[in-house]
Regions:
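Conserved Helicase C-terminal RecA-like lobe
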Residues: 1, 18, 31, 35-41, ...
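Conserved helix/coil segment N-terminal to the catalytic DExD/H
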Residues: 88-122
Length: 459
């Protein structure tokens, strides 16, 4: 297929070529993969400035998206892409093939550095979804940081560089420019641009930006950062977002209240114990969706209200495929049981079948199938069975359908259990307040509704 680059894509390609170390903050749907591959093609095969390229991406994107995109476009026919995914033998075979472009899953980086760090073969590295490197204490960050002196070009790609806070971008730029712009240490960056927010006498729980610090941060990184928004460049399909209220049956409502009050709930086949605020948030979300994991590891059915509501939405779609985003494994099992026509979208074959219209109900987990996947050809209806706290995963999953190439208006439905933590999660997503402190505040609010203020103060 012939690639006719839009003006914004041409500008992005040139930016990568002209900036050895840079960040592309490209909104979902702008074509960051073909942009980057086009820049690689120019750098490696026209200018001879790059010999080998490593693409670090979410597992499924590393396995499927980059090779598929290279094969799709005529001008990229000379690019050979090796996928270093699988067991150690398969990964080594791909790396030692000498392919111009090698793709790896991000969790493979420690293994890669341990085995190939001394004779590091890649002079250019692409961080696809660089926000996954926001934790400077992670093994992947430390491993990649150790080989930075051997890398001459680094490109970071993401649509959500700071999903929770501008604290998230420090580690990404530490890898991009070696600490030149935002400093070599997180503590120095934090002290310069942030001040304590929520704290106790001995511990700081959250940080907030100092006055105009965000503008100062943007000014620091501006010379190596290109940011583009989809609304400025794409004719995207209209998106309708709706909340579908779900009423819990009386027994489930009583169970929800008891769990909120006591943080304990006895079920017929096991005990549910929420040990802290984060644990209680998780348990309340499980219960709102219909089942609970017990201390014994079993999933106990509490209600089927959301299953029934989903059935009505599927029926209303009148045969049009519906994508359902789930969060808990217990929900996946229940969905597969309740809807025999459903199929989990977990591998390349199932995603091809979805795009071909062969799957009437596709079940997707946003954590494993959000970034970089093109699923817009298979349908335009999406239902959130359980809405997660993660704004990044939420936006990325929605963009699988609401993206360039979608031929129909997109409908996104949220099954929200009335008067439960579901309502607070969706509100947090709407206001983009999805920090840990928002989660704690939501749990406090749930406890306060049970008239046990002393319990709420424990957090």
């Amino acid at each position: 297929m012939q690639f006719n680059a839009h003006d914004y894509q041409r500008a992005a390609i040139d930016y990568v070529v002209e900036h050895p170390r840079c960040a592309l903050f490209l909104d979902m749907g702008l074509g960051k993969t073909v942009i980057t591959l086009s820049a690689i093609q120019d750098l490696a095969l026209n200018r001879f400035e790059v010999s080998r390229v490593l693409v670090i991406a979410p597992l499924r994107v590393a396995r499927d998206t980059w090779a598929d995109e290279a094969a799709k476009w005529d001008h990229l026919a000379s690019l050979d892409v090796a996928c270093a995914v699988g067991d150690a033998k398969q990964r080594s075979k791909a790396i030692e093939s000498g392919a111009l472009v090698t793709t790896v899953g991000r969790d493979t980086i420690p293994w890669l550095v341990e085995n190939y760090g001394k004779a590091w073969p890649f002079d250019m590295v692409i961080l696809d979804e660089s926000s996954s490197f926001k934790n400077h204490q992670s093994k992947r960050f430390k491993a990649l940081k150790s080989v930075l002196p051997k890398i001459t070009r680094m490109v970071a790609l993401t649509g959500t560089p700071a999903p929770n806070s501008l604290l998230d971008i420090w580690a990404q730029f530490r890898l991009i420019d070696g600490g030149q712009r935002l400093g070599h240490f997180l503590t120095h960056y934090r002290d310069e641009f942030f001040q304590p927010d929520k704290r106790s006498a001995a511990q700081i729980f959250t940080w907030k930006l100092k006055h105009d610090a965000d503008l100062a941060i943007y000014a620091r990184i501006n010379d190596i950062t290109l940011s583009m928004s989809a609304v400025d460049h794409l004719d995207l399909p209209p998106v309708t977002s709706t909340v579908v209220p779900v009423d819990l049956p009386a027994p489930a409502r009583r169970a929800y209240k008891q769990l909120g009050e006591q943080m304990l709930l006895a079920l017929p086949h096991g005990l549910v114990d929420a040990k802290n605020a984060a644990g209680l948030s998780n348990k309340l979300m499980q219960l709102a969706s219909g089942s609970l994991y017990t201390e014994q590891g079993t999933a106990e059915l509490v209600h089927s209200a959301k299953i029934e509501a989903l059935g009505e939405l599927i029926e209303a779609a009148s045969g049009s495929p519906v994508m359902v985003a789930y969060w808990f494994k217990s929900d996946l099992a229940r969905l597969l049981e309740a809807f025999p026509q459903a199929r989990e979208l977990s591998d390349a074959a199932s995603m091809r079948d979805w795009n071909a219209g062969r799957i009437p109900v596709g079940l997707i987990h946003p954590a494993s199938a959000g970034h970089g996947l093109n699923l817009q050809e298979g349908g335009h209806h999406m239902v959130w069975y359980t809405v997660p706290w993660s704004l990044e995963l939420y936006q990325q999953a929605n963009a699988r359908l609401a993206r360039q190439g979608q031929r129909f208006p997109v409908s996104i439905h949220h099954l929200i259990a009335r008067s439960t933590i579901d309502e607070r999660v969706i509100k947090a997503l709407e206001t983009k307040d999805v920090t840990q402190s928002a989660l704690i505040d939501a749990v406090k609010a749930e406890l306060a509704k049970t008239n046990h203020p002393s319990s709420a103060k424990e957090f």
